[in-house]
Each structure stands twice: as structure tokens, then as C-alpha cells.
Amino acid sequence: MSAEKSKIEHAPWAWGLPVTPPRAAAACAASPWTPRVPADIAQAGGRAGTPRRRAPARTLGHVIFAVPELVEQLVRFVAAGSEQAGAPRALHHCLLVNRLWHAVTVAVLRERLYFADARRLRQFAAAAHRGRLAPELVVLHKLTRLEQRDLDRALQHVSPERLRRLELYVCPRVLPPAGYLGRAGGLRRLALPGNKLVSDDFLIEACVHLPRLQVLDLRACDRVSDAGVVAVATNCPRLHTVNLGRHRNGHLITSVAVVALARHVQLETLGVAGCDVSDAGLWELAAVCGPSLARLSLNNCRYLTNRSVPALLELNAFPNLSVLELRNIPHLTDVRAVVRYRQWKRACGLPVLVEGCDRLTQLFRCEERKLCKENCASPVRDLAAWLRSEED
């Protein structure tokens, strides 16, 4: 009788817990996170008047969360989601789960270096590391007061061999050394928006060592001219996304750069906002990269006229275009083809976004009303013509 009573008190259902399979018992016991059953739950399993016994320690977590391979996949999934959402600190919550999750998360964090504070970057550079880190992603975000010596000191602890993405957002006073980029042959993405030090000489020296580069972001790098872009186009054949938009020194980027990119790489996204691109350059772009182009930014391109954008859209030279930016183009007045193109894409169920300034938006609305009236009047004219032909 006492043996049966002991079995009942120690049975899993007596505490309201799921039964752990025998094969998983060893793995659960070996888990570093083994919380004990609350006392009130354990006491509820005994009969009234019997001595209260403490329930044995049992794991509340599922056995799959103790498998390192599965934990690594989960942590990487969280890392990818936090990167897309722009919340790099979301991954830090995984550090607090248990020892296994902490170890896996630290390994993933060592592959992704993100700094939004210059003081923390200096602390990282001054800390004693056990060997060099080999991350895949290095991001510096809005470190406007960061000095070049601080960046050089930090990069001494970062090996470039496994580097895939290097992004320095609004870090105007620092520049990755050309020698460092020379050892980053696997780099896929280089983003230096708002950098005042990027020049043609830097691009000419660096692009030779970046044959696998796919994305180049040089927004607001107003010292770059056609010469630097031509060098990048001829040395980076896998390039598919280029952004050269700027507010100053637009005359340094002309149709020469656009033609070089069109002839040497297969562009999918091109941003030349504020550049002196002409109608001829846009025609060359459409002739070579028209089918592959998906996003095109032409804001503040003052030399474009009705002979390029409307005519090319009328000919469906960009069949897969989904984003078209046309703000502040003073010589663009005929927007009928633009409106028809947008209506055709919507009728086909294809996503399309055509952005314009206030003037162009007003022209779009007027042209849409005109087309609506013409479409409504067309059946009436056809019916009247049919009736007249029947009377004759």
C-alpha cells in the first residue's frame, strides 16, 4: 500500500506536468535550465493528513530546446527578423534563456557587429580580445564624431576574410582603409551614405579587390564622379543595386556613369536622384537593362524631358518596373503615358509605385480624369457609329 501511495505522489499527473518520454529524460536532466516545480503544486498532489514531500526536480522546457542545432536555427531566425525590423537589440533577449542559448547567441552576435555609439566602439577597440573576430556584418550607425584612428583601432580586431556586409551610415569622418577592403574579397554589400571622404581614387583602388560586390550605396557622397562609377562598373560584374543620389555636385554624375553601369552590370535598382542624367543616358539604360530594372529613382534630374520617361513607358521599355520616383523634374509635362503605364500595371495585378512632386501629382489626377471621360465616351461613339451603319 505504501509503495502504491509513493507512486501516486510522484506521478507526473499529480503535479499537472506532461509526461516526459523515457528517451528524453536523460537529455532533460542534462539541460542547464531545470526549474523546480512550485511547492503549492507539489503539495496539491498529496492526500489530506499525509506528510508533505517535495517533488523531484523536473524540466518544464521541451527537449527540442536543448538541441544546439535547433537552438542555432532559432537564434538565427530571430537575428534575421530583428535586422529587417531595425531592432538590433532584439537578439539580446536570447542571452537570458539558459546557458545553451547564451552560448549560441554569443556565437551569432560575434558574426554581427553593430555600433550606434562611438563610446562603445572605442571600448570595443580598447578591450582585450581572445583572437580576432570574423563577423559577416559590420554596421556603424550615425557616428558623426567618430575619428579615423578609432575605426582603424577597432578594425584591428575584425578579420575581413568572412565579411559580407560593411555599412557605415552617416559616418562622415571615417573611411574603411583600402588595404582592409583589399582582404575582403567576399564582400557583397558596401554602404557609405553621407560620407565626405569617399572619392574616385578610393573607389578605383578598392573596387579592384571586390569582384563579388552586389550592392553599392553612395548616397550623398558628393565627391564621387563618373570616373569612380566607371571603375566600379568595369571591376564589379555582379553589381545589381547602385544608389548615387545626392543634393550637391550633381554635375559630377552624368549619363556617362549610367551608360557604363548599363553596359557592364545587370542592374535591378538604380538611384541617380539629383544627377545630371540626360534623355540619351536613359534610353541607353532602357535598351540594355530595361527588362531587369525593378526600381528607378530620377528625382531632381533637371535635364530629363518628355522625350525620355513618357516615351519609354509608352513603349513598355521597363516591363518589370515596380518603383519609379519622378519628383521635381521641371521639363516633364506630358504624363499621359505615365498614367497609362500605372493603370496597365494595376489592371494586370502587378505592384507599382509612381511617386511625384505636388505639380506632377496634380497632373496625374487631371490626366486620370481625362482618360476616364474618354473611356466613358468611347462606347457611346461606337454604339452611335454602329446604329448609323445599320440605318445605311
UniProtKB/Swiss-Prot annotation:
Keywords from the named record: Cell cycle, Cell division, Cytoplasm, Mitosis, Nucleus
Transmembrane segments: none
SUPFAM superfamilies to which the protein is assigned, alphabetical: RNI-like
UniProt-listed GO biological process terms: cell division
Localization per Swiss-Prot or TrEMBL: Cytoplasm; Nucleus
Cellular component, GO, one term: cytoplasm
UniProt superkingdom: Eukaryota
Disulfide bond positions: none
Keyword Cytoplasm recorded: yes
Family membership: Belongs to the AMN1 family.
Summary of the function given for this chain in its UniProt record: Negative regulator of the mitotic exit network (MEN), required for multiple cell cycle checkpoints. Required for daughter cell separation and chromosome stability. Involved in copper sensitivity.
Protein name, UniProt field: Antagonist of mitotic exit network protein 1
Organism: Eremothecium gossypii (strain ATCC 10895 / CBS 109.51 / FGSC 9923 / NRRL Y-1056) (Yeast)
Taxon lineage: Eukaryota, Fungi, Dikarya, Ascomycota, Saccharomycotina
Gene: AMN1
